């Protein structure tokens, strides 16, 4: 049975970024630093050599209890007993890969616009890559999707997504601010003299956002009076009206939760991010986030393909 997919820092191999140092040496440093999912990406090696690399890397990742994903090749993933495969848009369809791999292995796919993300989710992908967020040498010539697409994915996609492409210690917080909660890096980690240190730093930033999001969400519902996420909702049949500010305009509403307010504005099924008093509220928590009088809500709706 496939275990639930839960990761924060995704590291991809890139042997061209560390000449003179072996792949296993570099990847073990990343694992010591907290990488919790690893991908073998090698576009040049013959298939037999790729299988041997995957087997050696699988031994290493297994020691740390971390999944190994193989880029592009479901057959290599099977031969090396890897945990899954990562596909590109021009690779084998997700459904065909699932037929080969069975239900117990992970299937991820790169996406570059929201339509591809929606299609991947419908097809049964376990996670998607969102990028490249910034220009990157790993994908030369590929137009950056910017953090706007990250925000769209955060607003709409229900399966895990990982932001990738040009992400560094310097810009990671910008990507997290846009809504990513999982980051992927190649050159910034494996091309660094100290991959372990970079991983610890990036993971620290991710963890800070996870913790800060929980605290901010609890504080964001403290509007006119202190309340918590467990604050009682109005009893069924009770009708109350409150004044809130929605996208800069004062409005009177009977909505008890952020989800009900979104429904009043007919935002169901649309690519929307919601902020309550300046804090982004994850979409899955809208239904349990109570509204109080005097609050300020911002709905940001994304149009187009990212």
Predicted feature locations:
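Compositionally biased, low-complexity segments
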Residues: 216-230
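Ubiquitin-like/PB1-type beta-grasp interaction modules and other compact soluble beta-rich domains
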Residues: 226-305
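C-terminal binding/interaction regions
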Residues: 178, 182
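Glycine-rich beta-strand-to-loop/alpha-helix junction loops that act as flexible
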Residues: 130, 163-167, 185-187, 305-306
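Catalytic-face loop-and-helix region of soluble metabolic enzyme cores
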Residues: 152, 158-161, 166
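Substrate-recognition "cap/lid" segment bordering the active-site pocket of phosphatases
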Residues: 139-151
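Conserved N-terminal beta1-alpha1 strand-loop-helix module at the mouth
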Residues: 1-91, 99-126, 142-145, 159, ...
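Active-site phosphate/pyrophosphate- and oxyanion-stabilizing loops and adjacent acidic/basic residues
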Residues: 55, 95, 151, 200, ...
């Amino acid at each position: 049975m496939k275990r639930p997919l839960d990761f924060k820092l995704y590291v991809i191999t890139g042997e061209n970024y560390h000449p003179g140092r072996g792949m296993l040496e570099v990847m073990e440093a990343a694992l010591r630093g907290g990488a919790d999912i690893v991908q073998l990406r090698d576009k040049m090696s013959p298939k037999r050599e790729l299988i041997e690399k995957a087997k050696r890397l699988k031994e290493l990742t297994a020691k740390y209890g971390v999944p190994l994903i193989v880029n592009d090749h479901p057959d290599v993933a099977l031969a090396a007993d890897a945990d899954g495969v990562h596909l590109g848009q021009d690779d084998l369809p997700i459904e065909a890969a699932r037929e080969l791999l069975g239900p117990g292995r992970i299937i991820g796919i790169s996406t570059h616009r929201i339509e591809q993300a929606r299609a991947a989710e419908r097809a049964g992908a376990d996670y998607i890559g969102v990028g490249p967020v910034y220009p990157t040498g790993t994908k030369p010539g590929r137009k950056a999707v910017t953090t706007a697409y990250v925000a769209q994915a955060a607003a709409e996609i229900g399966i895990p997504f990982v932001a990738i492409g040009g992400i560094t210690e310097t810009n990671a917080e910008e990507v997290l601010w846009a809504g990513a909660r999982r980051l992927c890096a190649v050159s910034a980690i494996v091309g660094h003299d100290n991959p372990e240190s970079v991983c610890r730093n990036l993971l620290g930033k991710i963890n800070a956002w996870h913790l800060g999001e929980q605290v901010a969400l609890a504080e964001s519902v403290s509007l006119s009076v202190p309340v918590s996420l467990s604050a009682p909702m109005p009893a069924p049949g009770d009708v109350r009206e409150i004044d809130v500010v929605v996208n800069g305009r004062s409005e009177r509403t009977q909505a008890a939760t952020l989800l009900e307010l979104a429904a009043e504005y007919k935002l169901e099924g649309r690519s929307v991010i919601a902020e309550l008093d300046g804090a982004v509220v994850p979409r899955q928590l809208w239904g349990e986030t109570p509204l109080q009088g005097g609050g300020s809500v911002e709905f940001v709706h994304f149009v187009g393909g990212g």
